[in-house]
Each structure stands twice: as C-alpha cells, then as structure tokens.
C-alpha cells in the first residue's frame, strides 16, 4: 500500500509537472504556492535540485532508493515510495512533531523528478543492500549516541 501525500501537495506537484512539460519552467505563482505549503524548505529543496544533489540509485531487481547530498555535506538516504528520509529533520519535524509534511530532501526528490534533474546510478543488488545496511547502522549508531547523551 503506497503512502499518499495530502491532496493539496499532490495537486501542486501535478500542476508543476504539467507546467514543466508545457513550457520547461515553473511559473512564479506555483513557486509561491510551493513556498506557502512548505515554507523555507521549498527554497532549500530547490537549491538542492539546482546543485544536482539528488541521485536515484537502482538495482537490477527494480529496487530504488534516493540519496540526497544535504547542504551540510551529509548524504541522506530516502525512500520516496513511503515518504521516508534518514535526516534528523524528518524524524523530528515530520514524524515526531508533525509540523512539516516533508523534509527538504524528500521535497527535492519530488522536484528533481518533475524537473528531470536527477542523477542516475545503477548498482548491483548486493551493492544496494550493503548501502542500506550501512545507512541502518549509521542511524542506529546516531540514535544510540543521542540516547546516551540524553540519559546523562
């Protein structure tokens, strides 16, 4: 079962995709709408797209993940199909506080898809598994570090 974005976001992204197909650009009014819905994350996501920071990693089995090089220089792994990002902002603002719909990395993925500005990397199934396992270990390590600091 796919996780759906709120209808207003789906509609906005659909209108933006249609504008890109028709004129190869996004009109200012749609960019203003994007900023209204996502706040400062919209500008930050567009900056990530402009810097070509989004990479789609795919394997022969059809598995797909995205990696986004964040503005801090860290790389975050994202699963667009279930709206997940490994960044701290996603965990805190999207999951815990529910005050954001998406983090800037996920928004950058959706924007790079519609602007056709996404890097492509094809890897073996084993390489993709290793990448995901490494990311999982990194997240667990960071969570363990965070937990031990808060318990002290």
UniProtKB/Swiss-Prot annotation:
Single GO term (MF): zinc ion binding
Listed GO CC annotations: nucleus; Shu complex
Predominant localisation class: nucleus
Keywords linked to the UniProt accession: DNA damage, DNA recombination, DNA repair, Metal-binding, Nucleus, Zinc, Zinc-finger
InterPro entries cross-referenced by the UniProt entry: Znf_SWIM (IPR007527)
Pfam families listed in its UniProt record: SWIM (PF04434)
Localization per record: Nucleus
Zinc finger extent (SWIM-type): 76-114
GO BP annotations, alphabetical order: double-strand break repair via homologous recombination; protein stabilization
Family: Belongs to the SWS1 family.
Role summary: Involved in early stages of the homologous recombination repair (HRR) pathway of double-stranded DNA breaks arising during DNA replication or induced by DNA-damaging agents. Required for meiotic progression, hence for fertility.
PANTHER family: ZINC FINGER SWIM DOMAIN-CONTAINING PROTEIN 7
Self-association and partners: Interacts with RAD51D and XRCC3; involved in homologous recombination repair. Interacts with SWSAP1; they form a functional complex involved in homologous recombination repair and stabilize each other.
Protein name, as recorded: Zinc finger SWIM domain-containing protein 7
Source species of the chain: Mus musculus
């Amino acid at each position: 079962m796919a996780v759906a974005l709120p209808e207003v976001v789906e509609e906005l992204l659909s209108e933006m995709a249609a504008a890109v197909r028709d004129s190869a650009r996004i009109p200012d009014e749609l960019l203003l709408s994007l900023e209204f819905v996502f706040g400062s994350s919209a500008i930050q996501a567009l900056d990530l797209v402009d810097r070509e920071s989004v990479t789609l990693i795919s394997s022969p089995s059809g598995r797909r993940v995205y990696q986004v090089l964040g503005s801090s220089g860290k790389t975050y792994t994202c699963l667009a199909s279930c709206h997940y990002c490994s960044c701290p902002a996603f965990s805190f603002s999207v999951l815990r506080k529910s005050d954001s719909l998406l983090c800037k990395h996920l928004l950058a993925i959706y924007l790079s898809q519609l602007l056709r500005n996404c890097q492509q990397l094809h890897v073996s199934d084993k390489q993709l598994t290793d990448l995901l396992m490494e990311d999982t270990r990194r997240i667990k390590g960071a969570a363990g570090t965070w937990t031990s600091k808060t318990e002290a």
